[in-house]
Amino acid sequence: MKKNIGKILAVILVVSVLATVLCACVPSNFSKAEANLKANGYVAETLENGDIANGANAMAKLAAAAYDITLTGKCDNIVTGVSEDGKQSVTIYYFDNAKDAKAFNKACKADLKKAKDELKKQKDAGNISEDDYKKALEEMKDVKFGVSGKAFYYGTKAAVKACN
C-alpha cells in the first residue's frame, strides 16, 4: 500500500510540474505566438529583421540600453499583442540565444523589486494611502514575464496565456 501511495504522489508531482512548465511558456515559434494571439481576439503583429532595416534587433538594442544590458547576440523577431479593449498586452522578444533572454528576465526582476521597494517607502512616508498601496501591488501581480527557451516575454497574465 505504501509503495502505491509513493507512486501516485510521484505521478501527481510530475503531472503538476509538466502542467506548470507547459502552461507558463510562450511558443518557441514567433509565427505560432502571433497566430494564437489573433485566434484569441488580440491585435498582433510581428517585427522581423529585414522589415525595417533589422527593426527587431534595433528595438531589442533600445530596450537593452534602457535596462543596461549588453546583448551577446541578436533579436530575430518581436511579437506584440494587444486586446481589443487595450487592457491586455504582451511583447515577446525572440533572440538567437538564451543568454540574452535571461539577461532581460534578470533586469525585469530587479526593476520589479525596486518598484515594490519604492512603493513601500512611499507608503511608509505617508505619501500614498494603504488602499493605494494595496491596489498598486495587486496591479503588479497581473504582470507576468519570463524566459521560454530563447524568448523573453512580458505582459499581462491574460495576454501571455493567449499566446499559447
Task: Indicate residue ranges for each PLM-predicted region.
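Gram-positive cell-envelope targeting signals
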Residues: 1-33
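N-terminal "mature-domain start" segment
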Residues: 25-76, 160-164
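Extracytoplasmic/secreted envelope proteins and their assembly/folding machinery
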Residues: 30, 34, 101-105, 109
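A short, solvent-exposed beta-edge/loop patch
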Residues: 120-164
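A short acidic-to-branched-hydrophobic micro-motif
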Residues: 80-104
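Short, surface-exposed beta-strand/loop micro-motifs that present aromatic residues
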Residues: 74-85, 139-149
